[in-house]
């Protein structure tokens, strides 16, 4: 990956959250783009990475959705006077990356106890599920951005996606009064190339070849003693003499030319 593509991939994390499709739509679009490569058993870089993220997102998404469903079901049995656990007592995504997976439950339980030692058990389970679902959602957000990048590189080409990310970031960073109303689209960037390839008109008949006919030489003139004399006349070969005819006499010579009969 060249340096421009590497920068564009890093800039994907800075794009607005609502720029990317929803998880279900994203996975469906990615599968449609990957289907031809799966049939041919392609081992291209973007195919392998996009396939990995499709599987990862599907598993994480189903698990996260299940956590939310169980947490919502527990709301009915939580005592109505229970105070929800504040966000500051729930483990965040950055903190979870530093904690071993086996110790995640213990760390979260210690925080809930520090908030309220006799916290109801159903409310504790609800707090755990909400914390884990939040961590999964942030991991899914990073994964879906990478999946979007790799399967769009298969659809449009890595160079076009790199160019598109650069233009989009420029548009987003420009004040609204100085930029266009609509954000640039990758279709608009690639459209001129497609039109140029498919819009050429073919002419009927044979085309006259160029460069096969000799060029006509332009006659240059020079001024000699006030008269214009053509260079073509100077370069003209002398006319051949007929046998027996006298040779032309030079104006500077005073002698007769010898007769060819002698």
UniProtKB/Swiss-Prot annotation:
Q: Which Gene Ontology terms cover its molecular function?
A: DNA binding; RNA binding; structural molecule activity
Pfam families in the cross-refs: Hepatitis_core (PF00906)
List the GO terms this entry assigns under cellular component, sorted alphabetically.
host cell; host cell cytoplasm; T=4 icosahedral viral capsid
Superkingdom of the organism of origin: Viruses
In chain numbering, motif Bipartite nuclear localization signal lies across: 215-233
Spans annotated as RNA binding: 254-260
Q: Which GO terms describe its biological process?
A: microtubule-dependent intracellular transport of viral material towards nucleus; symbiont entry into host cell; viral penetration into host nucleus
State the UniProt keywords alphabetically: Capsid protein, Cytoplasmic inwards viral transport, DNA-binding, Host cytoplasm, Host-virus interaction, Microtubular inwards viral transport, Phosphoprotein, RNA-binding, T=4 icosahedral capsid protein, Viral penetration into host nucleus, Virion, Virus entry into host cell
* Positions of post-translational Phosphoserine modification: 232, 245
Assembly with partners or alone: Homodimerizes, then multimerizes.
**Which family does the record assign?**
Belongs to the avihepadnavirus core antigen family.
Q: What does this protein do?
A: Self assembles to form an icosahedral capsid. Most capsid appear to be large particles with an icosahedral symmetry of T=4 and consist of 240 copies of capsid protein, though a fraction forms smaller T=3 particles consisting of 180 capsid proteins. Entering capsid are transported along microtubules to the nucleus. Phosphorylation of the capsid is thought to induce exposure of nuclear localization signal in the C-terminal portion of the capsid protein that allows binding to the nuclear pore complex via the importin (karyopherin-) alpha and beta.
What is the name listed in the Swiss-Prot or TrEMBL entry for this protein? Capsid protein
């Amino acid at each position: 990956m060249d340096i421009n593509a590497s920068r564009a991939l890093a800039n994907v994390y800075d794009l607005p959250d609502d720029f990317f499709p929803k998880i279900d739509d994203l996975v469906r679009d990615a599968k449609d783009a990957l289907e031809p490569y799966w049939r041919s058993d392609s081992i291209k870089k973007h195919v392998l990475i996009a396939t990995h993220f499709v599987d990862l997102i599907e598993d994480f998404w189903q698990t996260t959705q299940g956590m939310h469903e169980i947490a919502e079901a527990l709301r009915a049995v939580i005592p109505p006077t229970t105070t929800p656990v504040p966000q500051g007592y729930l483990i965040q995504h950055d903190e979870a990356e530093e904690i071993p997976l086996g110790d995640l439950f213990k760390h979260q339980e210690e925080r809930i106890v520090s908030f309220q030692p006799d916290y109801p058990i159903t409310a504790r389970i609800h707090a755990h599920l909400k914390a884990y679902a939040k961590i999964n959602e942030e991991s899914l957000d990073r994964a879906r951005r990478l999946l979007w990048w790799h399967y769009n590189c298969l659809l449009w080409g890595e160079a076009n996606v790199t160019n598109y990310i650069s233009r989009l970031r420029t548009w987003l960073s420009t004040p609204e009064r100085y930029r266009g109303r609509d954000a640039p689209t990758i279709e608009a960037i690639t459209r001129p190339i497609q039109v140029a390839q498919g819009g050429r008109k073919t002419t009927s008949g044979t085309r006259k070849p160029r460069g096969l006919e000799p060029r006509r030489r332009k006659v240059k003139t020079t001024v000699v003693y006030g008269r214009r004399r053509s260079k073509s006349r100077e370069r003209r070969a002398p006319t051949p003499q007929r046998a027996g005819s006298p040779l032309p006499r030079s104006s500077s010579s005073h002698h007769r030319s010898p007769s060819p009969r002698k």
